Regions:
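Fungal secretory targeting signals
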Residues: 392-393
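Predominantly extracellular/luminal regions of secreted and cell-surface proteins
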Residues: 1-12, 158-183
Length: 393
């Protein structure tokens, strides 16, 4: 788990209160420890990365200690939504805030040596992160000289994802920008409750979204809730990297918009309906309104009786209620341990979103029926039947 923090002189963490730009941090942490080391055996290791920093993005690479100009190869095997279709060899890896990746690194060639995991300045030019004297360092691996037997290998194929042909038309365009010092999406902030739903997507359809970073010298990792998407394209006045091979080999829910970059993502909006968020995952930008919502709309004549339908954000069962601040401080009343356990048990008994297979099958049947209806009504007025269930995993 990667993070970066500022400390005050007394050793306490510096607060983000009042910060409206970014909180980069000058102390790099891995699993809560500043610049740690790990003793490893000379064999294959599977390493999982989560960027949990408030704002800092990482451009990671491995080198032998003291030899900075010779990056070492590794295999990327998974991203936000799980395994890739196949391992992708790389010598560096961009990990923006909230992104997750898994790699396999082979330490067998470096018995008795030390390997450093390092970070390119300004995320190799993709980001605008402030750099400090040691933010180019992440951690060290100390490789044992004792021989071990390791018969593990990375399969050539990891899983099957049936990617179909690209859509040719963009369904929605979203511009991430700053206006009068405020972070916005298409001119709207999340506090604008009447206007913050920027897209209505029919349940079970596939859409192509264009995400544009037009905020000048900033970058934005964009997180879309509910869905796993495919990164289709990346372009822009300062973009030269395109879609990274390890991005396109799997599905994701966070994509990084570097300076002046635009990215196309394609997602299947299913199986649930309801209102979901999408936002910048730089937590300072997110907390200062760079967030909006999309509504996966109900299907007419769907015909499936969902017992765990949580699409209504105004459902009185989950609405905020007045409380006694004295009970909150004393942890009594509704804040007592017994009351909290009772509430958690009540939520568990609701079994939210437990009908995944049933709802998915019902959506399959719904769209097959509608596709047949359209075929039987050639020449008659009929709405377009969306492409459904693009991603079979």
């Amino acid at each position: 788990v990667l993070s970066s923090k500022y400390y005050n002189q007394d050793g306490t963490l510096q607060s983000s209160l009042g910060e409206t730009n970014s909180l980069w941090g000058d102390i790099i942490h891995v699993n809560g420890q500043p610049w740690p080391f790990l003793n490893v055996e000379p064999r294959l290791y599977r390493l999982r990365f989560l960027n949990a920093a408030v704002s800092r993005n990482f451009a990671l690479y491995f080198v032998k200690s003291g030899i900075l100009d010779a990056r070492l190869p590794f295999q990327v095997i998974a991203s936000d939504a799980g395994l890739l279709t196949n391992p992708v060899q790389s010598s560096d890896m961009y990990v923006a805030t909230a992104e997750r990746y898994e790699i396999v690194f082979d330490f067998s060639q470096y018995a008795g040596q030390t390997i450093d995991l390092r970070n390119f300045a300004k995320a190799n030019g993709i980001g605008v992160d402030d750099d400090y004297i040691h933010t180019d360092k992440v951690m060290r691996f100390v490789v044992s000289s004792d021989p071990v037997t390791d018969d593990s290998r990375v399969p050539d194929q990891l899983r099957q994802i049936d990617f179909l042909e690209d859509k040719t038309s963009i369904d929605h365009h979203f511009r991430f920008h700053r206006t009068n010092g405020e972070w916005r999406i298409n001119g709207i902030g999340f506090a604008d409750a009447e206007n913050r739903i920027l897209a209505k997507v029919p349940r079970g359809t596939v859409e192509l979204w264009e995400l544009e970073n037009s905020s000048g010298g900033w970058s934005h990792p964009i997180h879309v809730h509910l869905v796993d998407f495919r990164v289709v394209a990346r372009y822009g006045s300062e973009s030269t990297r395109g879609v990274m091979p390890y991005e396109s080999a799997g599905l994701k829910d966070v994509v990084w918009l570097g300076r002046h970059e635009t990215v196309l993502v394609e997602a299947h909006y299913a199986p649930w309906d309801g209102v979901y968020m999408f936002h910048c995952h730089n937590l300072i930008h997110e907390d200062h309104d760079m967030m909006a919502a999309f509504d996966v709309t109900k299907l007419d004549n769907f015909g499936y009786n969902e017992t765990t339908d949580f699409h209504d954000p105004e459902d009185i069962r989950w609405s905020a209620r007045p409380f006694d601040s004295a009970e909150f401080s004393a942890k009594t009343g509704i804040f007592s341990e017994e009351s909290i356990r009772e509430k958690v048990n009540t939520l568990a008994l609701e079994q939210p979103y437990s009908e995944l297979k049933e709802v998915t099958a019902a959506l399959d049947t719904y769209y097959k029926t509608n596709a047949k209806r359209e075929a039987d009504c050639v020449g008659e007025a009929a709405g377009p039947i969306p492409r459904y269930r693009r991603f079979q995993v």
